[in-house]
Amino acid sequence: MKNEINAVLENMTTTIPEPEDYTGEDGLLYCGKCRKPKEAYFAPDKAAIFGRDRHPAECDCQRTAREEREAAEKRRRHLDTVEELKRRGFTDPTMRDWTFENDNGRNPQTGIARRYVEHWEDMRTDNIGCLFWGGVGTGKSYLAGCIANALMEKEIPVHMTNFALILNDLAASFEGRNEYISRLCRYPLLILDDFGMERGTEYGLEQVFNVIDSRYRSGKPLIVTTNLTLDDLHNPEDTAHSRIYDRLLSMCVPVRFTGDNFRQETAQRKMESMKKLITD
């Protein structure tokens, strides 16, 4: 043990010189590049403790190298964290590509999505969610994914899924319904995509309500995308739908999506590309 302690003390108090280093007039080792000392003298009382009069000091070159190493390590840890968040947070790998950077800029609601991210702390504190509603292919899911990706890049956990998957998971869950729903509610932001497309059985509607109600009680924001209209949501067909929609509208600010069907445009471009390839 004594030898180990001595080895540690030796490492703490000894500087290994580089070929270009030199000894200054004060007797300390200096860096041959930046001309700053690589050693400093102990105070007299400390010198007695360590049995020597000097200890290593950082020159400018060493400080720069250390800061670069620390920055690289910080970047690596950040990338690892974001990768893990996206692995857990997305139920479809293609969602990773739904980013503001990849956006074509044509959706008029992009600004709202960006501001949601910019003001996330306020949204989180005030429990403000969004209900993205509108026609098929108008970019609702894409912008919800942009929000998810942007927040995860800030190391904020987000989960984006849909009720079809949730109902399947609940049916196959070994951890129990309550624990599964509690896990969903632990995410700072939950995004439910394609709401209203799930099967409308009594069991299905009950689980939909349980998830939304649990999220409501958690006090955490929720973003929902749906092809349903506000008229559909304000005029439910029965009591089961009424209590679901009521909870939803109390949590989420409606944002209407209008305009071109981007999926149809993409399909048309692919068709034209195929025609060109097979006719050339």
Language model segments and positions:
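A short, basic N-terminal segment
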Residues: 1-104, 267-280
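Walker A/P-loop nucleotide-binding motif
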Residues: 124-144
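Residue-level preference for the first positions of well-ordered beta-strands
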Residues: 127-131, 158, 189, 221
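Walker B catalytic acidic pair
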Residues: 194-195
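Pre-Walker A (pre-P-loop) alpha-helix and adjacent loop at the N terminus of AAA/AAA+ ATPase modules
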Residues: 88-90, 94-130
